[in-house]
């Protein structure tokens, strides 16, 4: 199955800005890979919470629409809130 997630590039980096984003219902994330610069991104929590419940989310190639450009990635790691059904951060790897 194909998954598409709209995202924007993050300009503010750090714990404080990540907390502000989470309060607004957004998820900070990073895309990295060999030979490419890491890119900090942010997307809406509602865009990923339902698709990550599918079993093939972690093994399939995802498409992130980053500022109008499509990037193919795989989910590498996901940090979740301790007791709330929320995602705190996602690491993606270039596919």
UniProtKB/Swiss-Prot annotation:
Sorted keywords for this record are: Ribonucleoprotein, Ribosomal protein, RNA-binding, rRNA-binding
Q: Which GO terms describe its cellular component?
A: cytosolic large ribosomal subunit
A biological process (GO) annotation for this entry?
A: translation
UniProt cross-references to InterPro entries, sorted A to Z = Rbsml_bL25/Gln-tRNA_synth_N, Ribosomal_bL25/Gln-tRNA_synth, Ribosomal_bL25_long, Ribosomal_bL25_short, Ribosomal_L25_dom, Ribosomal_uL5_bac-type
Q: Which Pfam families match?
A: Ribosomal_L25p
Please give the Gene Ontology molecular function terms for this protein.
5S rRNA binding; structural constituent of ribosome
Q: How does it assemble?
A: Part of the 50S ribosomal subunit; part of the 5S rRNA/L5/L18/L25 subcomplex. Contacts the 5S rRNA. Binds to the 5S rRNA independently of L5 and L18.
Protein family membership: Belongs to the bacterial ribosomal protein bL25 family.
Function noted in UniProt: This is one of the proteins that binds to the 5S RNA in the ribosome where it forms part of the central protuberance.
User: Which PANTHER family has this protein been placed in?
Assistant: RIBOSOMAL PROTEIN L25/GLN-TRNA SYNTHETASE, ANTI-CODON-BINDING DOMAIN-CONTAINING PROTEIN, RIBOSOMAL PROTEIN L25_GLN-TRNA SYNTHETASE, ANTI-CODON-BINDING DOMAIN-CONTAINING PROTEIN
Name assigned to this protein: Large ribosomal subunit protein bL25
Q: Which organism is it from?
A: Shewanella amazonensis (strain ATCC BAA-1098 / SB2B)
User: Gene that codes for this?
Assistant: rplY
């Amino acid at each position: 199955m194909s998954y598409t997630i709209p995202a924007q590039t993050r300009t503010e980096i750090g714990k404080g800005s990540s907390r502000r984003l989470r309060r607004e219902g957004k998820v900070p994330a990073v895309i990295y890979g060999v030979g490419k610069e890491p890119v900090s991104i942010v997307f809406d929590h509602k865009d990923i919470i339902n698709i990550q419940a599918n079993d093939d989310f972690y093994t399939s190639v995802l498409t992130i629409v980053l500022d109008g450009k499509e990037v193919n990635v795989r989910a590498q790691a996901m940090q979740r809130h301790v007791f709330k059904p929320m995602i705190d951060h996602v690491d993606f790897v270039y596919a």
